[in-house]
Amino acid sequence: MDQSKPSFFITTPIYYVNADPHLGTAYSTIIADVQARYRRSAGYNVKFLTGMDEHGEKVAEAAAKHGMTPQEWTDSQAPHFKELWSKLEISNDDFIRTTEPRQHHAVQYLWERMKESGYLYKGSYDGWYCVPEETYFTETQVTKSDEKNHTEGQHLCPDCHRPLERVQEESYFFKLSAFQDKLLKLYDEHPDFVEPAFRMNEVRSFVEGGLNDLSVSRTSFDWGIQVPFDEGHVTYVWFDALLNYMTAVGYGVDTNEARAELAYRWPAQFHIVGKDIIRFHCVIWPAMLMAIGEALPEHVFAHGFLTVRNAETGKAEKMSKSRGNAIAPQDVIDMLGVEGYRYYFMTDVVPGTDGAISFDRMEQVYNADLANSWGNLISRSLNMSGKYFDGCAPAKPASFDAFENPLAKIADGLVERYMAKMDALDYGGAKDEVMELIHAANHYIEDSEPWALAKDETKADELAFVIYNLLEAIRIAAHLLMPLMPQTSAEALRRLSCEDEAASDDLKGICAWGLLAGGQPVEKGEPLFPRLG
């Protein structure tokens, strides 16, 4: 493993396999993928982890409904996730499954460490449990139904509003209550541990309200990782699932290679999660790590839900199959293509908040940004270059001060502005920086009128200057859009005969103005973003 570069370790949640992957799981994964691609281009040695959460009562129930064993069911689901990630150009370096031997070994090692820590004890759990959410609730946290579609007085999950199960069983408990002050100190000393900031406020408020010890083993079913020192118990699904992040970088493996990887990779720089699992990642997970003396992840970024507008009420609603308003990833791919899909969800939906989506808005963004602006710039510029310079780019100007050069002025400092936005996962803001250059280049065409310059032999140098600047703007924009749209950006570079640049890991260096060689063949090609509608 090359450790000459700084490590950047980013993760998605590992996804439940009770159903096929949907827009929400794809959303989390593309957020992480864009960051991973960006960090590779900026010189980091990236490890990008995703995977499947295969244990727990919810998965066992889904398997039973399909007439399969839990292992058969999870084996049947894995290809659905891998196929969608491949289709969406996800560049993960690892795909972990919690049924793998490496996870079993790591979880059993965790149990031994927890036992040694003194933060584990055996007791009896008597309370409420939500199978769909895989979450325990106290009597004060639950609600009682007065809705017509539930039995009156029935205990409902405060998160998903489905009926709860009453659970009474012997269990091992993790002393989560012992970490209230330690967690609050963490939030004080590292205010960016949870992002966006308003999510940190939610987490802090929850912890300030007091923490109960957490039941971390189950005895009422057997689909899980066995507790090594008590064969009648299996591991609570979240106690298992959260550890996957460390399992993937060698936790608990007693070899020099594994220890070196763990030292290099851990802690993770970013956990990307949905807001519905923020307490597990920002309360339980850091407390677990504190208990066993391991470093904490640097940032947990919690994105919002994808919502759709109810045609009758006009209100935004969370997508769900039960409401009949769910949109399948393939529906969006069929409309926008993969690159348009990635672009829309990463730039028009603000990651930290809930985002209302619609096919009308998708078409509007695609046509305005990709077809009319970016795609149009590529087509017009390459067409003029080929037409006026015999299928090639013009020679590189001897001086960039010979004529007015508005594009070079915008490009000055562009990479730094873009990187600041990308570092903060503000993909919409980063896109705006690039689109400023693209819009300026389109205006530059209208203002400089290359077609008129081409008719005047005395303007040959100015024509070459204008076309070169347009091609150079395309080259730089392609590099900056690469994390969002890897295939079309690489294709834009190929049409400029700059395909070797696509693998660059020096983003600042490669985006310096004036690196286009000049004189090389260029290709207009088919439109990269055909207009919709």
Ranges and model annotations:
Residues 350-353, 357-361, 366, 381-430:
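Long, amphipathic alpha-helical stalk/connector segments used for oligomerization, subunit docking
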Residues 2-50, 102-106, 156-387, 432-434:
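Structured secondary-structure scaffolds
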Residues 94-105, 123-136, 200, 302-307:
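Short, glycine/charge-rich beta-strand/loop segments that flank catalytic centers
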Residues 1-7, 51, 123-128, 132, ...:
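Basic, alpha-helical terminal appendages of large translation-related enzymes
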Residues 128-133, 304-308, 361, 394-402, ...:
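A glycine-rich phosphate-binding loop feature that marks nucleotide/adenosyl-phosphate handling sites
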Residues 117-180, 184:
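Cys/His-rich short segments
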Residues 371, 375, 408, 412, ...:
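Generic structural concept
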Residues 2-122:
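N-terminal Rossmann-like or analogous alpha/beta NTP/dinucleotide-binding catalytic cores
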